[in-house]
Amino acid sequence: MGKIIGIDLGTTNSCVAVMEAGEPKVITNSEGNRTTPSVVALTEGGDRLVGQTAKRQAITNPENTVFGVKRLIGRKFDSPQIQGDKKVLPYKIEASANGDTRINLRGKQHSPAEISSFILANIKKTAEDYLGEEVTEAVITVPAYFNDSQRQATKDAGKIAGLTVKRIINEPTAASLAYGLDKKGEEKIVVFDLGGGTFDVSVLEIGDGVFEVKSTNGDTHLGGEDFDLRIIDYIADEFKKSQGIDIRGDKMALQRLKEAAEKAKMELSSAVETDINLPFITADASGPKHLDVKLTRAKLESLVADLLDNLVAPCKTALKDAGLTSSDINEVVLVGGMTRMPAVQERVEKIFSKKPHKGVNPDEVVAMGAAIQAGVLQGDVHDVLLLDVTPLSLGIETLGGVMTKLIDKNTTIPTKKSQVFSTAADSQPAVSIHVLQGEREMAAGNKTLGQFELTDLPPAPRGVPQIEVTFDIDANGIVHVAAKDKATGKEQSIRITAASGLSEEEIKKMVNDAELHADEDKKKHELVDAKNTAESLIHQTEKTLKEHGDKVDAATKTAIEAACEELKKVKEGTDAAIIKEKSEALTQASHKLAEAMYQQAAQESGQTEGAAQDPKGAAQDDDVVDADFEEVKDHKK
């Protein structure tokens, strides 16, 4: 049985870990890094790049380099979050036929789940290279405040990447596993997780291997990307003041600004001031323009003051929902790269009236927790019980457009709950079940997860039929809904997938495309290897001919030169088999030259040995030799 890996699929960076000798171990990628940028690019030549290689070329290929896709996953195109992102992202965001979000790369639409699958496939390969075996199963983390469609889309991404997702686990919960695995006493902790694109806060009780989530809250569209945007706007405004040019319309310049903003933000976690220098950022009639802006930590904090304020309410709500106060909390664990920012740490200390715990690596702790959960599922980790909760209330729309809740937020999962409803009109032949997720009283203010109908109801006065609606949330936080007419036993059910926008057929096609792409990658690799071998062979043959061509007859030399020319003609082509065939032909033709060289070397070696033996051969008088020898011996005596 292969290993189940733990994956933190992050907005900015992703990380993978596995259980080894009872401990979670983070796996380094091919470049020796412990995290991989969550960036995907499509080059002009049609090559797909993932990770650091994609990030490196972002400045020259901004429209076809996707970052922060986690903020788009499972969302409709007309949602305010997508409409806001559309204005600031350099790549094209479009609507699909059913209103879902799509990313256009070089004329082809991709779903956010598909883009995420490219990142997961890259991580899968990293794990396989390390483990030396195929990896087919994973535990993947998501923000605790992800709704059903976002969870389902993440699961779809895993499937497209060739992974069976054994469990979707909340990021703060995963972090608590890594933090508290060895803790013996009971503790009440808060996991404060501010990452690249999302914010979560969870309150947990941990002790003796039991990890019970009491409440969770957050914002799935608040993170480091938002802080970066504030810095980008500030730099662009300062440049416009000094040069009179707004560089935000230049996508290449904007990408340079993004990188500079990210770097400045990181530097200001340890320094109080930084210089942002971008030479040749743009040009006008007077010549090239250079950007040079100073940014202080105090200025940065003023730029993001409202974002820092937005961290407070979810924390207060989470404490209230858990029935606790800040004085009840033993530790506040910081997770996510953004928690390195001093202003964030100060705000956390102010909210919870205690200094936060910094003993875990905020970039790796979530992946390590996912690996521990993978170990639990695999049977390698014992005495660990994880009790997570659903982050949002679930219900259906009832008469008057009201949302009637069946499962309240922060209910421990898995869970199942039923409630009986009836018809609103006489002889109503069908009922429409509108499944909702959210906290608003009216249906219109909540997220639609899906709709289905229970039909062929027998004619009856209003209020008489008994329709039992059952909500079932599995351990992944994914919802299943069923409706049953108690009189006839007729039942209709739905596994909520509509909002993720990917049907089983679409997922199957993407899986096939991913497998095809893997084959294409293999073929490209073979072609590159064949070309490199051919190049090396041509160079070596021409060098050898130049130095030793006179050692073979004219016919052999001509045959070698002809084979060399044949290989030169095909080596720039795209058929690896033909290049290999012509390389083999040149190798065979060159054998005669090699034989001639060795024969000549052997002859020369033989002549040298013969010349060394001649003096001995000439002096065949044994007595003379003995006498000389004896004389020396006598003299010595």
From Swiss-Prot:
Annotated segments matching region Disordered: 597-637
A Pfam match: HSP70
- Supply the alphabetized keyword list: ATP-binding, Chaperone, Nucleotide-binding, Phosphoprotein, Stress response
Q: Which cysteines are joined by disulfide bonds?
A: none
Q: Which CDD domains match?
A: ASKHA_NBD_HSP70_DnaK-like
Q: Where is the composition biased (Polar residues)?
A: 600-610
Which InterPro entries does this chain map to? ATPase_NBD (IPR043129), Chaperone_DnaK (IPR012725), Heat_shock_70_CS (IPR018181), HSP70_C_sf (IPR029048), HSP70_peptide-bd_sf (IPR029047), Hsp_70_fam (IPR013126)
According to the UniProt entry, which residues carry Phosphothreonine? T198
Entries under PROSITE patterns matching the protein: HSP70_1, HSP70_2, HSP70_3
Q: Where is the composition biased (Acidic residues)?
A: 620-629
Which GO molecular function annotations are given, in alphabetical order?
Answer: ATP binding; ATP-dependent protein folding chaperone; unfolded protein binding
Question: Its induction, per UniProt?
Answer: By stress conditions e.g. heat shock.
Q: Which superkingdom, per the lineage?
A: Bacteria
Q: Which PANTHER family did the record assign?
A: HEAT SHOCK PROTEIN 70KDA (PTHR19375)
* Function in brief: Acts as a chaperone.
Name the protein family: Belongs to the heat shock protein 70 family.
Cite the HAMAP family for this sequence: DnaK
What protein is this chain from? Chaperone protein DnaK
According to its UniProt entry, this protein's organism is Desulforapulum autotrophicum (strain ATCC 43914 / DSM 3382 / VKM B-1955 / HRM2) (Desulfobacterium autotrophicum)
Provide the taxonomic classification.
Bacteria, Pseudomonadati, Thermodesulfobacteriota, Desulfobacteria, Desulfobacterales
